[in-house]
């Protein structure tokens, strides 16, 4: 399931503007995953952007950055025994730090970037397509469809929540009711929201003539 809060833009008192063609200035998205055969406990993923920071964990010293330098573009992995904090999403080497609940702190070695061929990962993808499924080129991909597909589905679930958040209807008094600000329940097998039909308009689209696959 997925739910979110988003930053709104106001050009008139008490009336949030609606810009469906663009993204909000900030958002906080929560995605909940049930237990599976590979992961026997439920898991929660929280995404923030637009300047929204997550709460600073108690076990991380107040003056330590969370994520990257300046607490910018980072990841916190919160587990049963401690928290891993690392930078991400830039050209710098990853510098993970482990904070244990028993008070110990460990600093991981800087990671090295994997060698890339000319034209980068795009070339590797083309080579894998030419070589075929289960080929050496396919198995060496750093973002194979096997997990890139479900990961993309996860990201798009957050977008579904964001796009649904500002859906509104005018009530009998002439005021706007934001009826879609709720937790969205996702049926992955059938690719649809089960508890808010209006949100399913964002799952797919009518493609222009000549662009169907």
Language model segments and positions:
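Glycine-rich, aromatic-lined ligand/substrate-binding cores of catalytic
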Residues: 1-144, 149-202, 206-213
């Amino acid at each position: 399931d997925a739910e979110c809060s988003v930053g709104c833009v106001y050009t008139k008192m008490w009336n949030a503007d609606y810009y469906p063609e663009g993204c909000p200035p900030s958002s906080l998205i929560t995605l909940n995953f049930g237990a599976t055969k590979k992961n026997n406990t439920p898991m929660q993923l929280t995404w923030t952007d637009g300047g929204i920071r997550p709460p600073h964990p108690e076990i991380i010293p107040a003056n330590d950055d969370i994520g990257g330098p300046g607490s910018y573009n980072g990841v916190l992995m919160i587990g049963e025994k401690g928290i891993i904090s690392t930078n991400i999403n830039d050209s710098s080497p990853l510098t993970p730090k482990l904070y244990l609940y028993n008070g110990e702190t460990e600093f991981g070695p800087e990671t090295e970037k994997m060698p890339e061929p000319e034209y980068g990962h795009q070339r590797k993808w083309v080579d894998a397509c030419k070589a075929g499924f289960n080929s050496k080129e396919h198995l060496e991909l750093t973002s194979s469809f096997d997990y890139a597909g479900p990961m993309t589905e996860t990201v798009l679930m957050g977008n579904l929540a964001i796009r649904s958040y500002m859906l509104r209807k005018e009530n009998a008094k002439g005021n706007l009711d934001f009826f879609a600000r709720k937790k969205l329940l996702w049926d992955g097998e059938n690719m649809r929201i089960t508890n808010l039909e209006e949100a399913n308009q964002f799952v797919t689209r009518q493609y222009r003539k000549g662009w169907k696959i």
